[in-house]
Amino acid sequence: MPEHVGKIVQVIGPVVDIKFDAENLPDIYNSIEIDMGDNKKLIAEVEQHVGDDIVRTIAMEGTDGLKRGMEAVNTGKPISVPVGENVLGRLFNVLGQTIDEAGDMNADKYYPIHRPAPTFEEQSVQPEMFETGIKVIDLLAPYQKGGKIGLFGGAGVGKTVLIQELINNIAKEHGGLSVFTGVGERTREGNDLYYEMKDSGVINKTALVFGQMNEPPGARMRVALTGLTMAEYFRDKGQDVLLFIDNIFRFTQAGSEVSALLGRIPSAVGYQPTLANEMGALQERITSTKQGSITSVQAVYVPADDLTDPAPATTFTHLDATTVLSREISNLGIYPAVSPLESTSRILDPRIVGEEHYEVANKVKHILERYQELQDIIAILGVDELSDEDRLLVGRARRVQRFLSQAFSVAEQFTGMKGQFVPVKDTIRSFKEILDGKCDDLPEAAFLFAGTIEDVKEKAKKMMES
């Protein structure tokens, strides 16, 4: 038997034990190929050396049909996936194989999915704002270039549309690229996203990688690394890349399943003892370098809404900003339904975004907080019972709240409203005018889904004429 070939000695679900010669044991994280016949190869990844020249591996696909005594080939390298321009517009699985039935892909380069994080010397230390063109985000919870953003929200509040608009804006305004990684979510959602991206025209600037709910835990645990590896290639070529991970909790969940299968003693709440280490290995690779940046937007599922659960708590330590989508705001018909008071950002700091931006954002938050406090009084007694000062504040707050809405390009075919990318300087100037009372005489309805303050005035003029 050739030196790099071993034999399967045990199969327990997705865990496959393989015996090699003592001198030729494969390294940890090496990929192992098992020939299943009918031109089908099963890939497994080495996780442990268990003694007696046996390695314990986790299969990336179902192990149906595996038998003891079957031959397994050590490839001598980790799982490697295609990178480069050719991956754009295509759908991949954890192994970098295309799953969109659009033919095979010829890739010039393959990168291993396990790679070191950039060194301190390579990293960019200058915090810089990442302009999204979405007013509520840019003003109140701005994203950092190379930062990590947590996206919180229940079903049907607009997470997917927000993600698509971000992909659209980075492609059209910054010429940037995106990688979408579906980790342990529903296959139907991935399918819908693919066709929606096709319809909205952003698919050619995006690579999609999926390891869905029905796949073995090994695939769900590693698929985030596959997407990240594709994004790293573009970053190292000088691009600004958006990396979407939906859902980061499923990455932890898959790691927990694998840990249990490997026989590790669980830690708090049944999670793997290596939770912080696994999360750190992924998150530390997502950063800005002197060449380019990877800005990551991660959907975060919070089990039972318990923020102290180890999985979300470990994720929070890595986040630079949070974007919280609120059902209350979507019920008001305001989209994007981003909660201006619950969303946060580490870079909303006068030294980074500038004094004027910081001041306007704080005033907007203050006026909305006060409006929230007054809502109980308004519900019981009505607006007329408020003092003149509070009545004026409520009027401005309602205008601000409506002006935080925005028409999206990717939703144009459903809403009939032309989408707008609003530069951050226009956003600041427009909100300043509302706060200074220059728009108190304009009707509230004119502020809904307007881009800049000039659009509001234009809409108000048309309303007056009609």
From Swiss-Prot:
It comes from Clostridium acetobutylicum (strain ATCC 824 / DSM 792 / JCM 1419 / IAM 19013 / LMG 5710 / NBRC 13948 / NRRL B-527 / VKM B-1787 / 2291 / W). This is ATP synthase subunit beta. Pfam families: ATP-synt_ab (PF00006), ATP-synt_ab_N (PF02874), ATP-synt_VA_C (PF22919). InterPro entries: AAA+_ATPase, ATP-synt_VA_C, ATP_synth_F1_bsu, ATPase_alpha/beta_chains, ATPase_F1/V1/A1_a/bsu_N, ATPase_F1/V1/A1_a/bsu_N_sf, ATPase_F1/V1/A1_a/bsu_nucl-bd, ATPase_F1/V1_b/a_C. The keyword Nucleus does not apply. Belongs to the ATPase alpha/beta chains family. Produces ATP from ADP in the presence of a proton gradient across the membrane. The catalytic sites are hosted primarily by the beta subunits. The gene is atpD. It is found in: Cell membrane. GO terms for cellular component: plasma membrane; proton-transporting ATP synthase complex.
